[in-house]
């Protein structure tokens, strides 16, 4: 150890842990506050949160309440406010971008994702790092601030090859599928990297009805070449309830696809795992890959059809590059 590191100039730079002691306690009424036990004056502050972690609870007038995305976002703002403008730079790592599905207006609707981005930058946030944003163009709401939407394509390829031994990566044996028109960009990139053909489904909806806030899907129509005898990878940004993913997989099996692999960045499984268990038992799907960027219950990790895609090392490398002001992409 260099003797100079003990001088005042190095105070706060060399430490056993670089994790700031932050707390978000609640009052009995359910109201919260942000507390930073450690000083962040002059430091780069990296705040990481999973807005989809529903396992956390707090008490409201004696009743247990699960943390919603709204609660997590409110706590994020409290922590930023607790810093009091003393941090040198504030960076928010939000793997699942809060309100990312509310990125465009249909009728008299709020633009929640754009509002969130503007609110954070108004509070002094310099950079927002997310993964596979539902529509990266939402960054147009904050054109003068840093916004990174990072792809997990490499990690999907890595863990698919590690988890399945007998894959043949060529256009005669494998194909990439987008489950809807919104995921075309991801599927095109994935297919080009591996040198595969791609196809897509589009959703026929009944625009005369609204069910659970959306026009119900009538059918999934396929556009693409023959999938018979091929392994197919369905690539998307998230599994919400999973019904659309299973419908697409069933349609591919009806067209005599060999095996179906589902690869999505965020596995929310909002309706549980029963339908995926049934799809696996019936041979509709073979494997489901999602990342650890959002909360994963133990039940999910134990499923025979599930492959966990670990992004921890990738995030660490990204933060290291950002901290030393190096580019995250090479031209």
Label each residue range with its predicted role:
Residues 1-325, 329-331:
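PRPP-associated nucleotide enzymes
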């Amino acid at each position: 150890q260099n003797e100079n590191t003990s001088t005042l100039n190095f105070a706060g730079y060399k430490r056993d842990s670089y994790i700031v002691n932050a707390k978000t306690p609640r009052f009995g009424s359910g109201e919260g506050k942000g507390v930073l036990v450690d000083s962040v004056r002059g430091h780069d502050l990296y705040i990481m949160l999973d807005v989809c972690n529903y396992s956390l609870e707090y008490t409201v007038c004696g009743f247990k309440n699960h943390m919603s995305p709204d609660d997590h976002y409110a706590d994020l703002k409290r922590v930023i406010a607790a810093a009091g403008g003393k941090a040198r730079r504030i960076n928010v790592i939000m793997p699942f971008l809060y309100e990312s599905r509310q990125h465009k207006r249909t009728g008299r609707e709020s633009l929640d994702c754009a509002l969130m981005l503007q609110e954070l930058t108004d509070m002094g946030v310099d950079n927002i790092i997310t993964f596979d944003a539902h529509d990266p163009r939402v960054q147009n709401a904050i054109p003068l601030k840093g916004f990174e939407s990072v792809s997990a394509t490499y990690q999907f390829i890595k863990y698919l090859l590690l988890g399945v031994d007998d894959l043949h990566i060529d256009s005669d044996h494998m194909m990439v599928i987008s489950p809807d028109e919104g995921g075309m960009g991801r599927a095109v990139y994935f297919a080009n990297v591996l040198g595969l053909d791609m196809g897509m489904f589009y959703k026929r909806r009944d625009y005369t009805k609204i069910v659970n806030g959306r026009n119900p899907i009538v059918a999934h129509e396929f556009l693409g070449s023959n999938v018979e005898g091929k392994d197919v990878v369905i690539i998307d940004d998230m599994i919400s309830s999973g019904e659309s993913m299973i419908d697409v997989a069933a349609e591919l099996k009806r067209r005599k696809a060999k095996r179906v692999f589902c690869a999505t960045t965020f596995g929310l499984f909002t309706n549980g795992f029963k339908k995926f268990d049934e799809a696996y038992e019936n041979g509709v799907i073979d494997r489901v890959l999602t990342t650890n960027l959002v909360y994963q219950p133990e039940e999910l990790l134990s499923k025979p059809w599930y492959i966990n895609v670990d992004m921890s090392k990738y995030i660490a490398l990204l933060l290291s590059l950002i901290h030393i002001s190096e580019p995250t992409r090479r031209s």
